[in-house]
Swiss-Prot record:
This protein's name: Transmembrane protein 205
Compartments where found: Membrane
Keyword Lipoprotein in record: no
Lineage: Eukaryota, Metazoa, Chordata, Craniata, Vertebrata
Domain of life: Eukaryota
GO CC annotations, alphabetized: membrane
Encoding gene per record: tmem205
UniProt similarity note: Belongs to the TMEM205 family.
Keywords tagged on the record: Membrane, Transmembrane, Transmembrane helix
Amino acid sequence: MVAEGDPGNLVKIFHLLVLSASWGMQCWMTFVAGFVLIKGVPRHTFGLVQSKLFPYYNHIVLCCSFISLAIYAAYHPRELLSPSESVQISLFFTSLLVAALQARWFSPVTTKTMFKMHVIEREHSLGQGVGLSANKEGYQLLQEKDPKYKALRKRFMRYHGISSLCNLLCLLCNGANLVYIALLMPTL
């Protein structure tokens, strides 16, 4: 017979720490780090820093998503899930799936495309301006006269957009799961 188990205090604490650490890291990377960097360092330096941070960030989020789902699923058998528990386990699964796509596909493709763009930009003395608005005309002119660069930029924007959506979806799933956990707490 299937029965729900009591995870015990250590498992509960570990689960909450993993989920909240992942969510906090996602908030920092999404809403703080990128905006601070893009306003403070040259564009190519920003891309280089992001290319070094994102693989670690994406794989940590992936691991945290896996751990969160595994712990939750271990103590909530499918046959006994309430409607709200079904939503919660679906959020954990969605977070895991999206984190895997982000870490293993979208982010690496975005980074590879960015580095190909950097090569062409350096040939045209672009990429050393600070901020997104630095030398907009130069980038626009490059797109107009170089079809290869234009295609790379289009590919970069597509994958960067998908990558950003994956990141936001993961952040929202983890945030919603934290809300579920908070609402189930009997007291602070």
